[in-house]
Structures are given as structure tokens and as C-alpha cells.
Amino acid sequence: MARLYVGNLDPRVTSGELEDEFRVFGVLRSVWVARKPPGFAFIDFDDKRDAEDALRDLDGKNGWRVELSRNSSSRGGRDRHGGSEMKCYECGETGHFARECRLRIGPGGLGSGKRRSRSRSRSRSPQYRKSPTYGRRSYSPRDRSPRRRSVSPVRGRSYSRSPRGRGGSPYADGRDGGRYRRSRS
């Protein structure tokens, strides 16, 4: 099986229209057209040679970009990202991922198998592992209340401009130049 990515599609194109264009090259397994966001589709061929023929003839036609998909398997989990070349982190074998590894899963189901031990430098120190509150954060009531903005005036007072300092730039000497003064109302 081979999967083609078809990009730069008109948002109104239907799976039937794509099926008509691609089925002349060989047997199709499925046609999936994206709707959110629109503009691309995946076409699954039974035979990789048929997909390559379609790629050669249809790439650029109607402004489409057609290329072999990097994920050429529709089965969930296995062979994703070229799984035959990827190695398992648990056992080092190719063809599966660590979450599917028989060493990790074991005979009793998920999590019952033996895992490789981590290096000493990456393990947590004992006092953190034994602490029941490790990873929890305690919040004080002060943390939960919204912070007060320091720029808002204190009740009972208002700020007004003083006529002094209106001539030059208020920032000429790095301060406000006396432009804003507080006065009681």
C-alpha cells in the first residue's frame, strides 16, 4: 500500500472528484479529504507503483501538489514514521515502538514487563521520591487572589497635572521632569 498527499486543493473539491482523477492509475483503498482546514487530501493506493504513476502525472495538474506521504500506513501505531527503520527504545529492535514492545508490555499486560533501568544521573534523589508532597505546589490565599495593579490611584486621592515642566521633553533627564504631581482633592 502507498499513500499520496495531495495539497493545494480547492476547498470545494469532493472525494468523488479526486477518486475519479486517481482511480485511472490503479486500485484505490481510500480517499480522505480534509475539511477543517480544507485544502489537502490523502489517497491510498493498493500498489506503490500505481501511486508513483499518479504522482508523476498529476503533480502540478490543476495547481495540485502531489507527493508520497511520509506516513504510508493507515494502521494505527505500527509502521508509523517509516516504522521499519525506526528502533524501539526499550529493546533496540526495529518494526515497533516502545509502547508496543513485548519487554514493556510483558505477559500480564501493559506495565508488567521489565524496563531498562535509567542511568544514575537521570534518576531522582531519594528524598524526592519518598516525599508524599513531591510535585505538588501549595498555594497560599495570597496566590489565589488577583494581583492589585500598582498604577491605579489610592481611594480618596486623584492625580492631576501640574503646569510646571510643560516646556521640554518630560524624559530629557531620565525622570518625569516634574510633569506629574500628586495633589489631594
UniProtKB/Swiss-Prot annotation:
The answer to whether the entry has keyword Transmembrane helix is no
Task: Read off the InterPro entries from this record.
Answer: Nucleotide-bd_a/b_plait_sf, RBD_domain_sf, RRM_dom, SRSF, Znf_CCHC, Znf_CCHC_sf
Locations of Low complexity compositional bias? 124-138, 151-162
Q: Which residues form the RRM domain?
A: 2-73
Q: Name one GO molecular function term.
A: zinc ion binding
Q: Which PROSITE patterns match?
A: RRM, ZF_CCHC
PANTHER family, sorted: SERINE/ARGININE RICH SPLICING FACTOR (PTHR23147)
Subcellular localization, as worded in the UniProt entry: Nucleus
Q: Which domain of life is it from?
A: Eukaryota
According to its UniProt entry, the function of this protein is described as: Involved in pre-mRNA splicing.
Which keywords label this protein? Metal-binding, mRNA processing, mRNA splicing, Nucleus, Zinc, Zinc-finger
Q: Which protein, by its recorded name, is this?
A: Serine/arginine-rich splicing factor RSZ21
Q: How is it modified after translation?
A: Extensively phosphorylated on serine residues in the RS domain.
Q: Where are the zinc fingers (CCHC-type)?
A: 86-103
**Entries under Gene3D superfamilies matching the protein:** 3.30.70.330, Zinc finger, CCHC-type
A single GO CC term for this protein reads:
nuclear speck
Does this UniProt record's set of keywords contain Secreted?
no
Q: Which is one Pfam family of this protein?
A: zf-CCHC
What does the entry give for GO biological process?
mRNA cis splicing, via spliceosome
* Feature: compositional bias, Basic residues: 113-123
The UniProt family comment states: Belongs to the splicing factor SR family.
Tissue specificity here reads: Expressed in roots, leaves and immature seeds.
